[in-house]
Amino acid sequence: MRMAHVADVHLGHALMNLRSREEAVMETFERLMEEVRECSVDVLVIAGDLFEHARPKTEALYLAVEKLSELKEDGVEIVATAGNHEIRRRKGAVSPISVLERMGLVRHLYYSERRPERHRYTATFDGVRVTFHGLQYLPKNSFVERAKVIRAKYRPDPEADVNVAIFHQALPGTIPDESEIVEPAYFPEGHDYYAMGHVHVPSREEKIHGSPAPYPGSPEPLTFLEVKDERGAHKRRGFFLVEFDRGGLVEYEFVEVEWSRELSVVEVSGERWEEELRRRVRRGQIVKVVAKDTGASPEEVEKVAIEAGADRCVVELRERRREVEEGDETEGPLDLEGIIREGVKRARAATLTRVDVPDDVVVEVALEILRGVREDNPPDLGDVEGIVAGEPPSEGSEESSEEPEESDGEEVGLEVEEVKVESRGTSSEGMSRAGSKLGSSGRPSLDRWIG
């Protein structure tokens, strides 16, 4: 039997609030679905974040219904779990994945202490019995604290020929944010294939307990950081085509899908930067220009890019520090506040978004950080970077301020002391704290995170 593994489509995403970016994401999704249909798969697995928002835009929902309906008409089974963008944030809210299930389009898998069998679905394809086990996204701390129950509940089905586990979590080495990384030791063992989501760049190198745990990535790059690899080449985009037989996994390969190429990162440097920029910008592109040692202002660089045909332009200046020659004297102390204020001004111009936080607040926070660094006691940065960029508060901060949903009263042993990880994961001190919290009757229920 054949399975398509996709993730992180983010229908409804619009970089810098540009309609063209929203359309690019949808158009690439249409091409992705056409490729999936051409591969004649038996099942499509969506490993989270089909949508950008828990309450998706009408056009995004309509397109998903249209394309998934076409697959269902072809006889394709669709199995999905919710990513962090689709998790309900208040009691009584409904995930868009649940809406698709109610329409008969997908099998929505998630773990709930009230409905313990919702995480598993078994079907037979061409004589191959397959059991899918799906878990909605959990913040790292929630995943680690519940590791033992997850490992117990998500054991492979011994009666199945193939077991596929679906997770929306980040493994070590996939993203730089350590607060999101979950070590493989916390995941259940024994599955033939781990269909992963949450990481936007494709990767097939990851393993969980010796089995493949690949990430298909986002079909359309969502940020400038996702456009090119370290060699400057465009990153591949697409999905994984996986083949199983009654003996388990046969093979899996990455199927490329053409994306818009609308986003571009252009690096220019030196005195001839203007000529180089005009040559490399294509009409209609949304460009991030990294200008190294040009001596130009952001406004000058942006003007040239727009004249060359760019639709929008974000500028990043990189200037080498000029060394002070022996005998030179400075005219006084650095005006840190002035430097920061100018940086905030440029950051706001570069993001092209409206920000309600006053400049004075951002400057004061930045000065406080610098004072802490100087005292060798840096404060918690929190959402400072997001404030400057005009981003909403992080999910972590939203989670901490949210009242957890009430538990259904079912007692589940959630101690995690049997799970061993390397030192780069959660510390032993942190593990013991987690263990002490989990025995209390007032623990938050996993139902809080139902997608």
Swiss-Prot record:
The keyword Metal-binding applies. The keyword Hydrolase applies. Pfam families: Metallophos (PF00149). Its cofactor is Mn(2+). Its EC number is 3.1.-.-. Homodimer. Forms a heterotetramer composed of two Mre11 subunits and two Rad50 subunits. Part of the Rad50/Mre11 complex, which is involved in the early steps of DNA double-strand break (DSB) repair. The complex may facilitate opening of the processed DNA ends to aid in the recruitment of HerA and NurA. Mre11 binds to DSB ends and has both double-stranded 3'-5' exonuclease activity and single-stranded endonuclease activity. This is DNA double-strand break repair protein Mre11. The lineage of its organism: Archaea, Methanobacteriati, Methanobacteriota, Methanomada group, Methanopyri.
